[in-house]
Amino acid sequence: MFIVVEGGEGAGKTQFIQALSKRLIEEGREIVTTREPGGCSLGDSVRGLLLDPEQKISPYAELLLFLAARAQHIQEKIIPALKSGKTVISDRFHDSTIVYQGIAGGLGESFVTNLCYHVVGDKPFLPDITFLLDIPAREGLLRKARQKHLDKFEQKPQIFHRSVREGFLALAEKAPDRYKVLDALLPTEASVDQALLQIRALI
């Protein structure tokens, strides 16, 4: 099973994934956790470039770097893990690119979606289920403000992050069978309980 966790800045994806992984391992599943950009040596190298506020990367170059990292990530890590029977949980995937670069970033939802869905062939490589940790932009940014160092996307203005939230919710509305929206203001364990019910329904 391939699970993706999406959400805006400060939604608590890292804590959610850690807690969800722990519960699934307790149920006897083999879990592989990963992230984007990252998840493989190429992805980790690209991550440093993409998140560095000092790097002046054009929007189209940024998009292509995300896609190159994802293509390698899918082939090198995700597909082999799934073929071996493991459950893969990824912190971000296609929809983050569609929202951050396509919708909020202005490159166009349809254009970016088409590129994402053909990054490893003619057919879209999609997760079995996507959990969207939904949080108001202001609340998420307040959480992030406690950190000492903010990456390029975390430093963007609140209007950008409001567009990110609206973009994710719009995608969730278009794909209700795949998307499950969780309230990121709830305690992490409460969200994990809800997620486990959805995962068990797919088994």
Swiss-Prot record:
The keyword Aminoacyl-tRNA synthetase does not apply. It comes from the Bacteria. Keywords: ATP-binding, Kinase, Nucleotide biosynthesis, Nucleotide-binding, Transferase. Pfam families: Thymidylate_kin (PF02223). GO terms for molecular function: ATP binding; dTMP kinase activity. It is an enzyme of class 2 (transferase). ATP binds at G7, G8, E9, G10, A11, G12, K13, T14. Its EC number is 2.7.4.9. The keyword Transferase applies. Gene3D superfamilies: P-loop containing nucleotide triphosphate hydrolases. One of its GO terms (cellular component) is cytosol. It catalyses: dTMP + ATP = dTDP + ADP. Belongs to the thymidylate kinase family. Phosphorylation of dTMP to form dTDP in both de novo and salvage pathways of dTTP synthesis. This is Thymidylate kinase. It comes from Chlamydia trachomatis serovar D (strain ATCC VR-885 / DSM 19411 / UW-3/Cx). The gene is tmk.
